[in-house]
Amino acid sequence: MTAEAAGRYATALFELAKSEGAAEAVEADLAALRAMLTESPELADALASPLHAVEVKAGILSALAKKAKFNVLTANAFGVAARNGRAGDLGDLARVYAALAAADRGVVTADVQTAAALTKKQTEALAASLKSAFGREIEVRTEVRPELMGGLIVKVGSRMFDSSLRSKLDGMKTAMKEA
């Protein structure tokens, strides 16, 4: 899903959920979906695959929403996304929705990718450091990406800080090719 499309879907869902008093429930549902997609690459692949019909993807999402007891607005949004060929992009929609909900609460969201899981103490220290830098309350969302090899990538709004070992090695590789 393009950032623009994810923004449109997420904004529409957020406004509807907020007007229905279900913004937090939908946010929790979408966070659960993101976790499912991360934990089950097979699910993510099935939703993104052009080999599966729209109806199959809609059925998968409907069953998932029912089993997880998701809010009806979340389930309906899954159906709309599937019918419009966007089932594979629900992770992006969930990410944008979370940012909208956090902004509505006056909290800035920091997406942090690390090679290994951060401890609670490390996450709290990072949040405090980011709060000091941005002057606002920070909500840290972490994602483990072993391919980074070490270090971390922090994305806050349109700003990104990449201190991963992978990017440093890629930079060295490029410099060596140019030499």
From Swiss-Prot:
GO cellular component: plasma membrane; proton-transporting ATP synthase complex
Membrane topology: Peripheral membrane protein
GO MF term set: proton-transporting ATP synthase activity, rotational mechanism
Major localization class: membrane
Location within or outside the cell: Cell inner membrane
Keywords, ordered alphabetically: ATP synthesis, Cell inner membrane, Cell membrane, CF(1), Hydrogen ion transport, Ion transport, Membrane, Transport
SUPFAM superfamilies, per the entry: N-terminal domain of the delta subunit of the F1F0-ATP synthase
Summary of the function given for this chain in its UniProt record: F(1)F(0) ATP synthase produces ATP from ADP in the presence of a proton or sodium gradient. F-type ATPases consist of two structural domains, F(1) containing the extramembraneous catalytic core and F(0) containing the membrane proton channel, linked together by a central stalk and a peripheral stalk. During catalysis, ATP synthesis in the catalytic domain of F(1) is coupled via a rotary mechanism of the central stalk subunits to proton translocation. This protein is part of the stalk that links CF(0) to CF(1). It either transmits conformational changes from CF(0) to CF(1) or is implicated in proton conduction.
Family: Belongs to the ATPase delta chain family.
PANTHER family for this protein: ATP SYNTHASE DELTA CHAIN
Subunit structure: F-type ATPases have 2 components, F(1) - the catalytic core - and F(0) - the membrane proton channel. F(1) has five subunits: alpha(3), beta(3), gamma(1), delta(1), epsilon(1). F(0) has three main subunits: a(1), b(2) and c(10-14). The alpha and beta chains form an alternating ring which encloses part of the gamma chain. F(1) is attached to F(0) by a central stalk formed by the gamma and epsilon chains, while a peripheral stalk is formed by the delta and b chains.
UniProt protein name: ATP synthase subunit delta
Organism placement in taxonomy: Bacteria, Pseudomonadati, Pseudomonadota, Alphaproteobacteria, Maricaulales
